[in-house]
């Protein structure tokens, strides 16, 4: 799959942008704060109906305007897809795929797939479990609508369970009904996450080995607060029962997929706690490029690769690995110059100079 064309109107600092993209490498160069990342953000938004930089959609609208527009034409093996999104200042959005209105965000997932790699992705390793859960959830949602709908349902039931826990008129019988529903969704979520981690381990072993010239081994381990061998549902129900007193005191559900995490080990050392910044960056790179392989395995097409100002952050080995993988993958890169890229550009590649929200060449 690849993006054939992109159109932006009143999106951040772009009043009007219309571009035809290459199936291969597309490079947006320019000084900082000129609008390079805004192009990548708009593409990401069309895949997930949300920005990777802000939770406030109104931030995406040019400050002089009341609405912004994004339109993508995506080429796929079977059928081209046109995605049109209108973002309103009141927080609402209207999404159409091939002129058909999308009523639920989950219906958008999988229309086309992206993998983004940016300097902020170091947070996946360095910061809280919530960021690592978000990584897993976003990757799984774009390849499985069933995962998305189970996740939405789980969070809905979880919120309702927490309301019951805090209620003065606490009813244990009602709580047990919610527990059974919660366990059903959780069972699916955890099993899908475990399978995804297994796939990252499979592909990540080869990717990490190539980046480090065989000097390091990497392992990803899912960390669930629910210990089980075969019957996850039973184990989770027992945990909910055992934690009931504490959950009532705190007014929250203290265990479940919403509290899970995963650990990254390089040569049996916890990378979050003891890894160097270079090792942490390599771990993220391994995760992201494993996701490329996983999406290709499942959808039979490579996703679009978005590289947001990361090349300057990578040492020569990591940079060489990234640039050597660009064959057969539409890649959209932002950077301040193309010196590092010249050997990897061909006749199909396109380079766009960005200056204050305009393409100047």
Curated annotation (Swiss-Prot):
Q: Where in the cell is it found?
A: Cytoplasm
User: Which residues participate in ATP binding?
Assistant: 30-37
GO molecular function: any one? single-stranded DNA binding
Q: List the disulfide bonds.
A: none
PROSITE patterns assigned to the protein according to its UniProt record, in alphabetical order: RECF_1, RECF_2
- Keyword DNA damage on entry: yes
Question: What's in the keyword line of the UniProt record?
Answer: ATP-binding, Cytoplasm, DNA damage, DNA repair, DNA replication, DNA-binding, Nucleotide-binding, SOS response
Show the Pfam families listed in the entry: SMC_N
Question: What residue intervals traverse the membrane?
Answer: none
One cellular-component annotation, GO: cytoplasm
Summarize the protein's role: The RecF protein is involved in DNA metabolism; it is required for DNA replication and normal SOS inducibility. RecF binds preferentially to single-stranded, linear DNA. It also seems to bind ATP.
Q: Which family does it belong to?
A: Belongs to the RecF family.
Its name, as the record gives it, is DNA replication and repair protein RecF
Tell me what organism the protein belongs to: Clostridium botulinum (strain Eklund 17B / Type B)
- The UniProt gene name for this protein comes to recF
């Amino acid at each position: 799959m690849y993006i054939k064309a992109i159109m932006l109107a009143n999106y951040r600092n772009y009043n009007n942008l219309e571009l035809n993209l290459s199936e291969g490498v597309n490079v947006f160069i320019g000084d900082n704060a000129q609008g390079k990342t805004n192009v990548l953000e708009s593409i990401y938004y069309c895949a997930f109906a949300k920005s990777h930089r802000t939770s406030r959609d109104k931030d995406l609208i040019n400050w002089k305007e009341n609405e912004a527009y994004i339109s993508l034409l995506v080429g796929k093996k079977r059928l081209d897809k046109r995605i049109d999104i209108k973002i309103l200042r009141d927080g609402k959005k209207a999404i159409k795929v091939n002129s058909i209105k999308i009523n639920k965000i989950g219906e958008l997932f999988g229309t086309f797939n992206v993998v983004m790699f940016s300097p902020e992705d170091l947070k996946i390793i360095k910061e809280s479990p919530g960021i690592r859960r978000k990584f897993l959830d976003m990757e799984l949602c774009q390849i499985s609508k069933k995962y998305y709908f189970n996740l939405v349902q789980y969070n809905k039931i979880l919120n309702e369970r927490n309301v019951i826990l805090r209620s003065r008129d606490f009813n244990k019988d009602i709580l047990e009904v919610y527990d059974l529903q919660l366990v059903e969704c959780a069972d699916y979520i955890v099993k899908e996450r475990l399978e995804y981690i297994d796939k990252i381990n499979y592909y990540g072993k080869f990717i990490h080995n190539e980046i480090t010239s065989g000097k390091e081994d990497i392992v990803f381990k899912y960390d669930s607060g629910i210990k089980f061998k075969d019957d996850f549902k039973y184990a989770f129900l027992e945990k909910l029962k055992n934690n009931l007193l504490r959950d009532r005191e705190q007014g929250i559900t203290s265990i479940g997929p919403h509290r899970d995490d995963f650990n990254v080990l390089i040569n049996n050392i916890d990378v979050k706690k003891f890894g160097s910044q270079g090792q942490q960056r390599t771990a993220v790179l391994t995760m992201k490029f494993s996701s490329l392989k996983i999406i290709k395995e499942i959808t039979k097409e490579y996703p679009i690769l978005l590289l947001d100002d990361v090349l300057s952050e990578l040492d020569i080995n990591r940079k060489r690995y990234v640039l050597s993988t660009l064959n057969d993958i539409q890649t959209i890169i932002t950077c301040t110059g193309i010196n590092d890229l010249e050997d990897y550009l061909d006749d199909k590649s396109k380079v766009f100079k960005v200056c204050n929200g305009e393409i100047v060449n």
